[in-house]
């Protein structure tokens, strides 16, 4: 399906491992526009007499579009670099990830409200046996 492929291109360009605020904002706009286009143009063939794989695929793409938006919002909200989330604005002078454990040592969950808006909820993590430390891969 074209929408699925286009969504992958948007995410690869704007929300890959190396991310910037400008790229994330552009990706968010593109995903929202793609979702509007999807719902305006989606056509599902088949009937209800048996399993409709076209409907299943369309619903899966709809889920991917929503997940992509939340993933981008989360990356925008997270003002640090850590692991597979590298924000170009949050790097050391040597190009290494600049973590912010005080603010981001947590588990986040996003909730979609009745108006379609998204809210992040977070729960702090605690490490009692192993101290947190920055890993050096050099």
Where are these regions (language model features)?
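Glycine- and aromatic-enriched mobile tails/lids
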Residues: 1-138
């Amino acid at each position: 399906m074209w929408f699925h492929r286009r969504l992958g291109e948007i995410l690869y360009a704007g929300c890959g491992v190396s991310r910037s605020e400008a790229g994330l904002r552009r990706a968010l706009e593109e995903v929202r526009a793609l979702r509007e286009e999807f719902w305006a143009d989606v056509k599902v063939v088949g009937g209800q007499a048996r399993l409709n794989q076209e409907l299943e695929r369309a619903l899966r793409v709809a889920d991917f579009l929503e997940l992509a938006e939340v993933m981008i919002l989360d990356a925008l909200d997270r003002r640090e670099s850590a692991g597979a989330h590298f924000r170009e604005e949050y790097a050391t002078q040597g190009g290494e990830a600049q973590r912010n454990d005080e603010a981001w040592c947590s588990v986040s969950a996003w909730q979609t409200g009745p108006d379609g808006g998204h809210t992040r909820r977070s729960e702090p993590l605690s490490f009692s046996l192993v101290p947190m430390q920055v890993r050096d891969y050099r």
